[in-house]
């Protein structure tokens, strides 16, 4: 069985006329100085399938209400062929899966177990159209609330979303190297032309703020350092849709969106959720009975 984690890689070409032309190929595990993640139990491994039940790709995501999983728009984009999903919240959800023989992990990944969804929403991601405002946010609505599943005991609370404009003040702040974020996901941990390493296990790492106001971010994305130096880590294929958390809190400020190369080196780019239109869209596409449970807080 071929098993692909999804991440978006942005190829940039600056034309002589000064226009930025964007081309995209699949891009979005934790790399560098990562550690096993037992703290962010609301981060799940998401496998997507087409209408026939054939696996299409995998991502990461955060359960922000009993039935609402926040991920990236390129994960739920209809052009992937995905119409349904299955989510596991074990920290070692995919450990033991053999892609050569198709033998599933003890959790059942990628064929059984977990919780299911037949409702996928894409905020408007369309192959980086409108860049840098790529609308790269998605929702996976569970068929049944998590409270009725085997994972119920993990969810005594849910992560919050950062209120509108929470990151705006950082755009002009000096000493950005001191602003720390936390990433979590189930993606690849090493990619190079020779090999890739995938634990399919929830891992976490710290990242540092690089930029909020250049041509690649411009108020819509946040650029963080993916360099493994100085105790930091980064993200890679399969981490797409996973959370970018403010410092060491459980407040989500962005979702993992894209990188600039296929080897997961350099910088990571996350699509911000601390924007009024995004927050309104999330609430509007969440079950009415759960909207009041989605926390939106100030940093």
Task: Describe the role of every protein-language-model region.
Residues 25-29:
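Sec/Tat signal peptide C-region and signal peptidase I cleavage site
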Residues 51-54, 227-228, 233-237:
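Short loop/turn motifs at secondary-structure junctions and domain boundaries
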Residues 12-22:
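Bacterial N-terminal signal peptides
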Residues 36-42, 57-58, 62-108, 199, ...:
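C-terminal subregion of chymotrypsin/trypsin-like serine protease catalytic domains
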Residues 2-12:
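Bacterial N-terminal signal peptides that target proteins for export
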Residues 30-39, 53, 82-166, 170:
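Conserved catalytic-core segment of clan PA serine endopeptidases
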Residues 38-46, 179-181:
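Short, hydrophobic/aromatic-rich segments at coil-to-beta transitions
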Residues 133-232, 268-269, 275-280:
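Chymotrypsin/trypsin-fold serine protease catalytic domain
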């Amino acid at each position: 069985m071929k098993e692909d984690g999804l991440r978006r890689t942005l190829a940039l070409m600056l034309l002589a006329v000064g226009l930025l032309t964007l081309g995209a190929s699949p891009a979005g595990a934790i790399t560098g100085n990562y550690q096993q993640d037992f703290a962010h139990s609301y981060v799940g491994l998401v496998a997507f399938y087409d209408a026939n039940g054939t696996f299409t790709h995998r991502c990461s995501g955060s359960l922000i209400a009993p039935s609402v999983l926040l991920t990236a728009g390129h994960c739920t984009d209809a052009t992937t062929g995905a119409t349904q999903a299955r989510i596991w919240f074990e920290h070692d959800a995919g450990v033991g899966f053999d892609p050569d023989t198709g033998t599933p992990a003890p959790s059942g990944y990628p064929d059984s177990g977990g919780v299911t969804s037949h409702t996928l929403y894409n905020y408007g991601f369309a192959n980086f159209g409108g860049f840098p405002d790529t609308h790269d946010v998605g929702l996976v609505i569970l068929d049944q609330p998590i409270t009725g599943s085997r994972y119920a005991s993990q969810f005594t609370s849910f992560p919050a979303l950062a209120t509108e404009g929470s990151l705006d003040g950082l755009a002009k702040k000096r000493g950005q190297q001191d602003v720390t974020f936390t990433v979590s996901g189930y993606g690849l941990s090493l990619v190079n032309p020779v090999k890739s390493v995938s634990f399919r296990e929830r891992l976490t790492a710290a990242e540092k703020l690089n930029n909020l106001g250049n041509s690649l971010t411009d108020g819509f994305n946040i650029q963080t350092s993916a360099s493994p130096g100085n105790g930091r880590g980064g993200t890679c294929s399969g981490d797409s849709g996973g959370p970018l958390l403010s410092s060491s809190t459980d407040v989500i400020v962005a979702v993992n969106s894209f990188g600039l190369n296929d080897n997961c080196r350099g910088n990571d780019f996350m699509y911000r959720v601390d924007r009024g239109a995004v927050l309104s869209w999330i609430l509007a596409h969440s079950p009415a009975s759960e909207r009041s449970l989605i926390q939106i807080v100030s940093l």
